[in-house]
Curated annotation (Swiss-Prot):
Enzyme class: ligase
Protein name as it appears in the record: Proline--tRNA ligase
Any coiled-coil regions, as ranges: none
PANTHER family recorded: MITOCHONDRIAL RIBOSOME PROTEIN L39/PROLYL-TRNA LIGASE FAMILY MEMBER (PTHR42753), PROLINE--TRNA LIGASE (PTHR42753:SF2)
Disulfide bonds: none
One Pfam family it belongs to: tRNA_edit
Assembly: Homodimer.
Family matches, as HAMAP family: Pro_tRNA_synth_type1
This protein's UniProt keywords: Aminoacyl-tRNA synthetase, ATP-binding, Cytoplasm, Ligase, Nucleotide-binding, Protein biosynthesis
Description of its domains: Consists of three domains: the N-terminal catalytic domain, the editing domain and the C-terminal anticodon-binding domain.
Gene, per the UniProt record: proS
Species the sequence originates in: Clostridium botulinum (strain Alaska E43 / Type E3)
CDD domains linked: ProRS-INS, ProRS_anticodon_short, ProRS_core_prok
Length: 570
C-alpha cells in the first residue's frame, strides 16, 4: 500500500476520552474512530490488524477440525424462549421487533442458534462429532462501555460449539479447543493464562478462561506462587484453616446497642473479627437465602447464585424482607432462629468455635455460637479468597491480580440440547441429547490486549504475526527521483516475496513519517535517503537500533526476521 493513497489520520495528542493504552493508541494510530458510546468504526489499518488476528484463529480452528459457517446476527425470540433465556438474559440484550411485531434480538451469544442447527441437521451418531464455529459481530448493551473496544456494545467474537455423542467425546473436543487456544494466543504474541472459571449465564459444568494480566482488567485472578493453580475470583478456593479446638461454651446474649458493623462489635466485645460471623440476606428468584461467613470475609455472590440454582442475577433483600426474616434492624441478624428458605454456611464457619453473631434482636448479639449445636445449613464455599491465603492444591501463597478475559471454554453438557429437545439417534437406536461444548474468543478484545502488552512511549509495537503491515519503506525526500525510484523498487521486491509493505511516498517531513511508522507499530522500517549514493539504506526494527545495510540485502534481512519468528512468508 502506498501511503499517498491510504486513508490514514494519526493523532499527536491523546484523546480525552481514552483511559487505557490500547484505546489511546488505537485512536492515535488511526485504527478506530468512535461512532457512539461503545460503538466504533474500524478504519483500514484497524481492520487489517483485526483480520490478522482472525486469520490466526481461523487457521488453528480449522487445524483442530472445526468447520466455519456464519449464523444470522438477528435471532427470533422463540429460540431464546425455548432455552429459557429470553427473560433471564437481562438488559444487556438488544431486543427489536419487526413490522409484524415479532420479537427478535441482536445476538449477544449464539448457543440457541447452533443448537437449533444441530437439531435440524444432525440425525445420527454416525455424523458425530461435529464442531462448528463462526467469526461474527455480537451486540451487548453494556451498562457502562469503556476502554475502547475492550468493553464495547458491538464487538467481533469467535464462537464455536462442539456436538458429541457422549462425555468422553466432549472431553476430547474440549481438550482440542484448549490446545488450539494456547496456540492461538501464543501466535498472537499474547501472554494469556488459563484459569478455572465460573460458567455464568451460559451454564454448563467445567469452565476455563484465558486471561491476560491488566491493571484495568474487570476480573480478579488468583494465582499460586508455588504451583500452576490459577482461577477467577468467582471460582477460586483456598486451603481451609485447621479446625478450632475449644470447649463449647453456653450461648450468651449481650447488649450491643450502637454496634451494627463487624468492626464495631469486635471493638465493643474486645475480640478479633475472625471470631465473628456475619449474615447476608439475598432474594434469589423470590426465595430468601441467608449466607453466613466469617466476619472478616467477603461473600462471593457468584458462588451463592450457583449454590442457590439462581436463574439470573441475585439481589440483596429489601428492608421489608429483611425485617420479616430477622425481626431486627440492620446489623443484628444471625443464624439462630432466622426465617429463610435456604441457609448457606461457609465451610470456614463450620470449623469455628464460640463465635459471635447477631441475635436477630435489635441492639443485641450472641456469644459462643457453634455450628451444629446451635444452627445448621448447607456447608460450602461461599466467600472470596484473599491475598496471602494458602493454595488449596499445594499450600503455597495465593496472590491476586486484575485480568481481562480474552477466551473462555465451557463443557455445556446437555443444558441446551435438553431444553431445546435437540437429539440424535444413538448407537442403541434410541434418541439422546447432544453433549455440547462452547468455546469463545473475543477477537477485538484480543487485538486490544495485544496492544496493551506490546507498546512503548512512541506507540504500538506489533508482534510480526499480527502487524497490519510488516515493513514501512520511507522515501525521505519525495522530490528526489532516485530516492523514490529505489524506495519503490524495494517496496515492489518485498511484496513479491510475500511481505506486506507500506511505501511512505507522502510529501511530508521525514520526522512525520518516522513518527507515524512508530505509532502504527510497523515492525520494520527501511529508510531510503542520502546513503543511496553508496548503495545503502537504513534498516531498523521497531524496538531496535538503526543499522546501515546494502540495498541488495534488504529482502534477505527482512526474510531473516520472519525466520527468527518462525513465520512463513505468504
Amino acid at each position: 500500500m502506498k501511503m499517498s493513497n491510504m486513508l490514514i489520520s494519526t493523532l499527536r495528542e491523546v484523546p480525552a476520552e481514552a483511559e487505557i493504552d490500547s484505546h489511546k493508541l488505537m485512536l492515535r494510530s488511526g485504527m478506530i474512530r468512535k461512532m457512539a458510546s461503545g460503538i466504533y468504526n474500524y478504519m483500514p489499518l484497524g481492520l487489517k490488524a483485526l483480520k490478522k488476528v482472525e486469520d490466526i484463529i481461523r487457521e488453528e480452528m480449522n487445524e483442530a477440525g472445526a468447520q466455519e459457517f456464519l449464523a444470522s446476527a438477528m435471532i427470533p425470540a422463540e429460540l431464546w424462549q425455548s432455552s429459557g433465556r429470553w427473560d433471564a438474559y437481562g438488559a444487556e440484550m438488544f431486543r427489536v421487533k419487526d413490522r409484524n411485531e415479532r420479537d427478535f434480538c441482536l445476538g449477544p451469544t449464539h448457543e440457541e442458534v447452533f443448537t437449533d442447527i444441530a437439531k435440524n441437521e444432525i440425525k445420527s451418531y454416525k455424523q458425530l462429532p461435529v464442531n462448528l464455529y463462526q467469526i461474527q459481530t455480537k451486540y451487548r448493551d453494556e451498562r457502562r462501555p469503556r476502554f475502547g473496544v475492550m468493553r464495547s456494545r458491538e464487538f467481533v467474537m469467535k464462537d464455536a460449539y462442539s456436538f458429541d455423542k457422549d462425555q468422553q467425546g466432549l472431553d476430547l473436543s474440549y481438550n482440542k479447543m484448549y490446545e488450539a487456544y494456547v496456540k492461538i494466543f501464543n501466535r498472537c504474541g499474547l501472554d494469556a493464562k488459563c484459569v478455572e472459571a465460573d460458567s455464568g449465564a451460559i451454564g454448563g459444568s467445567n469452565s476455563a478462561e484465558f486471561m491476560v494480566k491488566s491493571e484495568v482488567g474487570e476480573d480478579d485472578i488468583v494465582f499460586c506462587t508455588e504451583c500452576d493453580y490459577a482461577a477467577n475470583i468467582e471460582k477460586a478456593t483456598a486451603r481451609l484453616e485447621e479446625e478450632e479446638k475449644e470447649e463449647l461454651l453456653e450461648v450468651e446474649k449481650v447488649s450491643t446497642p450502637d454496634s451494627r458493623g463487624i468492626d464495631e462489635v469486635s471493638e465493643v466485645l474486645n475480640i478479633s473479627s475472625k471470631k465473628t460471623v456475619k449474615t447476608l440476606l439475598y432474594n434469589v428468584d423470590g426465595k430468601i437465602v441467608a449466607v453466613f461467613v466469617r466476619g472478616d470475609r467477603e461473600v462471593n455472590e457468584v458462588k451463592v447464585a450457583n449454590a442457590s440454582n439462581a436463574s439470573g442475577d441475585i439481589e440483596m433483600v429489601s428492608h421489608e424482607e429483611y425485617m420479616n426474616a430477622t425481626g431486627c434492624g440492620i446489623g443484628f441478624a444471625g443464624p439462630i432462629g432466622i426465617k429463610a428458605d435456604l441457609i448457606l454456611v461457609d465451610k470456614e464457619v463450620k470449623n469455628m468455635c464460640n463465635f459471635v453473631t447477631g441475635a436477630n434482636e435489635t441492639g443485641y448479639h450472641i456469644k459462643n455460637v457453634n455450628y451444629g449445636r446451635d444452627f445448621e445449613g448447607i456447608i460450602g464455599d461461599y466467600r472470596n479468597v484473599v491475598e496471602g491465603e494458602a493454595c488449596s492444591i499445594c499450600g503455597g501463597k495465593l496472590t491476586i491480580s486484575r485480568g481481562t478475559e480474552v477466551g473462555h471454554i465451557f463443557k455445556l453438557g446437555t443444558k441446551y440440547s435438553e431444553a431445546m429437545d435437540a437429539k440424535f439417534i444413538a448407537e442403541n437406536g434410541k434418541e439422546a441429547p447432544f453433549i455440547m461444548g462452547c468455546y469463545g474468543i473475543g477477537v477485538t478484545r484480543t487485538m486490544a490486549s495485544i496492544i496493551e502488552q506490546h507498546n512503548d512511549e512512541s506507540g504500538i509495537v506489533w508482534p510480526l504475526a499480527v502487524a497490519p503491515y510488516h515493513v514501512s519503506v520511507i522515501a525521505v525526500n519525495v522530490k528526489d527521483e532516485e530516492q523514490v525510484k529505489i524506495a519503490t523498487k524495494l517496496y515492489e521486491d518485498l511484496k513479491s516475496i510475500g511481505v506486506e509493505a507500506l511505501l511512505d511516498d507522502r510529501n511530508e517531513r521525514a520526522g512525520v513519517k518516522f513518527k507515524d511508522s512508530e505509532i502504527m507499530g510497523i515492525p520494520m522500517r527501511i529508510t531510503v535517503g542520502k546513503k543511496i549514493v553508496d548503495g545503502e539504506v537504513e534498516f531498523k526494527l521497531r524496538t531496535g537500533d538503526m543499522e546501515v545495510v546494502k540495498i541488495e540485502d534488504v529482502c534477505q534481512i527482512v526474510k531473516g526476521e520472519f525466520d527468527k519468528n518462525n513465520l512463513k512468508l505468504r
